[in-house]
UniProtKB/Swiss-Prot annotation:
Root EC class: transferase
Subcellular location field: Cytoplasm
Entry cofactors: Mg(2+)
Signal sequence region: none
Summary of the function given for this chain in its UniProt record: Transfers the 4'-phosphopantetheine moiety from coenzyme A to a Ser of acyl-carrier-protein.
Superkingdom of this protein's organism: Bacteria
Keywords: Cytoplasm, Fatty acid biosynthesis, Fatty acid metabolism, Lipid biosynthesis, Lipid metabolism, Magnesium, Metal-binding, Transferase
Family of the protein in this entry: Belongs to the P-Pant transferase superfamily. AcpS family.
E.C. number(s) listed in UniProt: 2.7.8.7
Protein name stated in the entry: Holo-[acyl-carrier-protein] synthase
Listed GO biological process terms: fatty acid biosynthetic process
UniProt GO MF annotations: holo-[acyl-carrier-protein] synthase activity; magnesium ion binding
Amino acid sequence: MIYGIGTDIIKIDRIAAALGRHGDRFAERILGKEELEKYHRRKAKVEARGLRFLATRFAAKEAFSKAIGLGIHMPMTWRAAQILNAPSGKPIVVTSGKLAEFMQENGLTAQVSITDEVEYAVAFVIVEKK
């Protein structure tokens, strides 16, 4: 049964501006450990790839927070939800800490779809209740 849906679109220039103002501290605030490692690897190869990666993760976390009905409020924090990849490459939501407990206690699972183009990053999340 569908528990909630969420979508988010962000102009990639907004993420670039935030990075310009705050540097990598902005990425460190938004990304979990595994995401941050991937961000740095992508950014080191091609800066635009790192920027698009950060924008898609930002959009996905916003969409996820809407789908679970909490917004960015405890137990939902930026780093408690990571958007990682299954071995197939499919993006997946991986939660930790109090957010993982919330998901388990409520019998919730999430599916995420992300995409980006030159100007925008978009994410769509469906949260299902078992």
